[in-house]
Amino acid sequence: MRPDGRKPTQLRPVKIIRDFNIYAEGSVLIEMGNTKVIITASIEEKVPPFLRGTGQGWITAEYAMLPRSTESRSIREVVRGAPSGRTQEIQRLIGRSLRGVVDLKKLGERTLWVDCDVIQADGGTRVASITGAFIAVADAMIKLTESGKVRQNPLKDYVAAISTGIVGNEVVLDLNFKEDSSAKVDMNLVMTGSGNFVEVQATGEEYSFTQQEFDKMLEYGKLGINKLIHIQKKFIEGMPSIGHWKRLSIKEFSYTDTGGN
């Protein structure tokens, strides 16, 4: 039995509130269980020096945790003087995941900044950031297209992420902090709406896992991502094959998983 009584393939309750920030081109508050992340997408009309004159844009992500997002207060990284290795790893993961579904040439010479601020952490902050960030980025891309600054929406596909792992002797989906802390194996999976992989991170903790266990984690992860993309489609209507993307009118959506397909 899992600490919160969920089935092995059951997501925590998911809630997304759109336009959480009144200034950003795109913003959401995403909740996955007790994990809560605010995400904003901001467009800047310039690119990093290495892209100047190329006609290509860039997407970069920043990630931070509020001091009391965890059980005990942590020191702000700006006070420490530099982001930790963990923070840098997560920022790169979020950026890679979003660049995987955006045509940077169509974006033109502009930068999309994605800021992910964890206000409460209970496991899965990086995957919640990616899943929520897609909606914020999509809203920003739709606004950019409707303004006439780009000819065609740069979005290529949906993208979402989820954690899975082995806790005790059982493969489970969407680990909370207690499960993550005791997991033998932890996997983070990032996939597109068309079923392609952007990233697979799987690590054993004093444990080596079998091909069969890996396949089962992958199966559970794909199941979870399909559910999350279904939620994204409540906010964004997309037909990637013809480059059609539309912002739907819904502002808030809550989803309770029953653990089925």
Swiss-Prot record:
Residues that coordinate or bind phosphate: R86, G124, T125, R126
Subunit note: Homohexameric ring arranged as a trimer of dimers.
Signal sequence interval, chain numbering: none
Pfam family, one: RNase_PH
InterPro entries named among the record's database cross-references: ExoRNase_PH_dom1, ExoRNase_PH_dom2, ExoRNase_PH_dom2_sf, PNPase/RNase_PH_dom_sf, Ribosomal_Su5_D2-typ_SF, RNase_PH, RNase_PH_bac-type, RNase_PH_CS
Similarity comment: Belongs to the RNase PH family.
Job description of the protein: Phosphorolytic 3'-5' exoribonuclease that plays an important role in tRNA 3'-end maturation. Removes nucleotide residues following the 3'-CCA terminus of tRNAs; can also add nucleotides to the ends of RNA molecules by using nucleoside diphosphates as substrates, but this may not be physiologically important. Probably plays a role in initiation of 16S rRNA degradation (leading to ribosome degradation) during starvation.
Top-level division of the source organism's lineage: Bacteria
Enzyme class, broadest EC rank: transferase
Catalytic activity of the protein: tRNA(n+1) + phosphate = tRNA(n) + a ribonucleoside 5'-diphosphate
Gene label: rph
Protein name: Ribonuclease PH
PROSITE patterns: RIBONUCLEASE_PH
Enzyme Commission code: 2.7.7.56
Keywords in alphabetical order: Nucleotidyltransferase, RNA-binding, rRNA processing, Transferase, tRNA processing, tRNA-binding
Organism: Persephonella marina (strain DSM 14350 / EX-H1)
